[in-house]
A protein has these predicted regions:
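Conserved PLP-enzyme active-site core in the AAT-like
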Residues: 1
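An anionic, glycine-rich sequence signature occurring as long contiguous blocks
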Residues: 5-111
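Basic, amphipathic alpha-helical segments enriched in Lys/Arg and hydrophobic/aromatic residues
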Residues: 108-157
């Protein structure tokens, strides 16, 4: 984080203690900012609630200092309802330099990232038939995925 750019980073299991603290923060009574979206597409309805908290109000100083200019914690609560009535519910957590008050802007960054990821995976599957790959031994699947991404980057230039 050398530059002064804004960031929105997905919080995953590789930061176990921080992930637990962030998750716990959303069960408290801190001041929160929320933004809701509803999308109907491809035979499903997706409801998303983006909730942001000021990081300094819920994390200790050492946790905040570990992330340059950390300003907010974000929870995305996503409920997907399929046309047959089946529901899938998931929560994801993010760290951001953007202020919690800007939760709508933060949501657009998160959705934009999902769009890029979806297009990448679509290309890997359709162009390279990655889902049909039977490589399972040791690091073969990971190595082939890296080669496909490299090939896609070269072709896309």
């Amino acid at each position: 984080m050398e530059s002064e750019a804004d960031y929105v980073l997905a919080l995953k299991g590789n930061h176990k203690h921080l992930a637990e603290d962030v998750k716990d923060a959303f069960t408290g009574r801190s001041k929160e900012f929320a933004y809701n979206t509803l999308e109907k597409d491809h035979g499903r309805v997706e409801e998303r609630t983006y909730t942001a908290l000021c990081s300094q109000e819920v994390l200790d100083e050492s946790q905040c200092d570990a992330w340059k200019n950390l300003s907010s914690l974000i929870q995305v609560d996503r409920l997907v309802t399929l046309s047959d009535g089946t529901e899938r519910h998931e929560k994801q957590y993010y760290l951001s330099r953007l202020p919690a008050e800007g939760v709508e802007k933060i949501s657009s960054y998160i959705r934009g990232h999902w769009g890029i990821e979806n297009r990448l995976h679509w290309h890997l599957d359709v162009t390279f038939r990655e889902d049909h790959c039977r490589a399972r031994k040791e690091y073969a699947a990971t190595n082939l995925n890296t080669i496909r991404k490299l090939a896609l980057a070269i072709v896309s230039q």
